[in-house]
Amino acid sequence: MSSAVARFDVQDPKELIRIITEVVIAHLEGGGAPVAAGSAPADVAALIDHTLLKPDATRADIERICHEAARYGFASVCVNPWYVPLAERLLRGSGVKVCTVVGFPLGATLPKIKLAEADQSLTLGAREIDMVLNMGALRSLEDDLVEAEIRAIAELCHRAGAICKVILETALLSQHEKVRAALIVKVAGADFVKTSTGVSAGGATLEDVALLRATVGPEMGIKASGGVRTLSQLHAMVSAGATRIGTSSGVKIMQELSGNTG
């Protein structure tokens, strides 16, 4: 965390984290300015990562979500690495990016394996990588390891012209751990911090999104994932600070927006 410490007159990284955490939580308790959530269909669609990460997803399922994503103009489709080549072929020229996951869903894969997984996915056509942070290392206070792993994948993504998002799995972390993790992700150079895998017991909450926004500031991306199934939930997450929504309910949300729920 030396790059973060250099910006403050604090020598101990743990003390730096403690100070920033207290400031962030105090800011959150005092309320913050909400982010406006537009309702134009193109604006809403551009927020959505159309997601299908179920282990039993078939080629037909992937074809369906790719066609849906192209029809509505979603930001990306998020699929397991096995389906990256198929999604890339189906979406080529559509403007919809292919997103995939690394170290999913536990985040406990060895760093070199995560890096290789990201590298091959990028080679196959992924342009957004959602990697899972090593929660065990984070909770064991091995911040240097966590930062190094994220930095390596973020730099790999950026060399390929791709985006790196880091999943925290907020449902498993304390408030202080969420803040610490988000700061590490920011210092490591990732583009987004993401709340959840959607596999664990809890998904995105408004409180967590607001906490992450207060932590990383106004410029960094925040992806809310897990449990966002309606237009009102999407707007609430954006108002709390999310700039991307991971959901398998993208079509339902767009139909709700147009008044067609049939």
Language-model-derived ranges and their functions:
Residues 34-72, 82-222, 230-256, 260-262:
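Alpha/beta enzyme core
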Residues 1-38:
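Protein-protein interaction and targeting regions used for scaffolding, dimerization, and localization
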Residues 225:
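Short hydrophobic "strand-cap" motifs at the C-terminus of beta-strands
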